[in-house]
């Protein structure tokens, strides 16, 4: 898939089971006021005005459903496009599958920047997406939105014994979308033999593991991750306020 030079492509890994939500279906396909989380996430990215194309990775048996829903939702939206691909066994592999649809950084048509966004952060406001892209265009090669912590954090061992209490002032709760210069993210995933040996919970961790510098920008409370039934209830209340 070729895109115009200088563009921003967002990748949405949405193939996970989401067992903590206990909905009986993949989490990204839970509905929030009649629209699935993945639909809300994809449309939110495109409507931000700074994302040119979205590649969403879903379970193989959900491809047709996702294509139909997005085609209906974007039918009257000029210049807004999404590609649906089969995801992998975990988040990292789903991102790999999505990246494989894009031209390599050295090829004509490669995007300038890539965002990676959780489908479960379905209420992420446009202002946060813009903030991440603005930081990329300002010269940072890896950008994550994050919020200060309000809770005290304890490090514990396997038996639940407290090992220490890190200073909260230097800690942040990281959100998505996370943004990267295309070449940096591409190289991180291409150096792939190590991917199965380390549990990377986000893409910035992978970049850090390879020595990359990651810039934090202000996050947004509305970009919370819908992981449990309580989160889903909160999201519904926010939409209906």
UniProtKB/Swiss-Prot annotation:
Gene3D superfamilies per the UniProt record, alphabetical: Spore Coat Polysaccharide Biosynthesis Protein SpsA, Chain A
CDD domains assigned to the protein according to its UniProt record, in alphabetical order: CDP-ME_synthetase
Residue numbers marked as site, Positions MEP for the nucleophilic attack: 168, 225
Pfam family, one: IspD
EC assignment: 2.7.7.60
InterPro entries xref list: IspD, IspD/TarI, IspD/TarI_cytidylyltransf_bact, ISPD_synthase_CS, Nucleotide-diphossugar_trans
Any GO BP: isopentenyl diphosphate biosynthetic process, methylerythritol 4-phosphate pathway
Catalytic activity as recorded in UniProt: 2-C-methyl-D-erythritol 4-phosphate + CTP + H(+) = 4-CDP-2-C-methyl-D-erythritol + diphosphate
PROSITE patterns: ISPD (PS01295)
Function: Catalyzes the formation of 4-diphosphocytidyl-2-C-methyl-D-erythritol from CTP and 2-C-methyl-D-erythritol 4-phosphate (MEP).
PANTHER family: 2-C-METHYL-D-ERYTHRITOL 4-PHOSPHATE CYTIDYLYLTRANSFERASE, CHLOROPLASTIC
Protein name stated in the entry: 2-C-methyl-D-erythritol 4-phosphate cytidylyltransferase
Native source organism of the sequence: Mycobacterium leprae (strain TN)
Gene: ispD
């Amino acid at each position: 898939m070729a895109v115009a030079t200088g563009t921003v492509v967002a990748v949405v890994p949405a193939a996970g089971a989401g067992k903590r939500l206990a909905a009986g279906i993949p989490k990204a396909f839970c509905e929030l006021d009649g629209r699935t989380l993945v639909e809300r996430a994809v449309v939110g990215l495109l409507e931000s005005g700074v994302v040119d194309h979205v590649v969403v990775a879903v379970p193989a048996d959900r491809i047709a459903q996702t294509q139909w829903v997005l085609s209906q939702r974007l039918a009257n939206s000029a210049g807004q496009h999404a590609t649906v691909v089969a995801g992998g066994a975990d988040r990292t592999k789903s991102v790999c599958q999505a990246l494989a649809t894009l031209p390599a950084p050295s090829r004509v048509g490669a995007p300038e920047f890539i965002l990676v966004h959780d489908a479960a952060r379905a209420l992420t406001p446009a202002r946060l997406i813009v903030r991440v892209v603005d930081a990329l265009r300002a010269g940072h090669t890896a950008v994550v939105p994050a919020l200060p912590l309000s809770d005290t954090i304890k490090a514990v061992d396997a038996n639940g014994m407290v090992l220490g209490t890190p200073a909260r002032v230097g800690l942040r709760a990281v959100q998505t979308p996370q943004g990267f210069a295309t070449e940096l993210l591409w190289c991180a995933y291409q150096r792939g033999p190590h991917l199965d040996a380390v549990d990377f919970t986000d893409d910035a961790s992978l970049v850090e593991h390879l020595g990359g510098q990651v810039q934090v920008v202000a996050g947004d409370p509305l970009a919370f991750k819908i992981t449990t039934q309580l989160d889903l209830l909160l999201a519904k209340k926010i939409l209906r306020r």
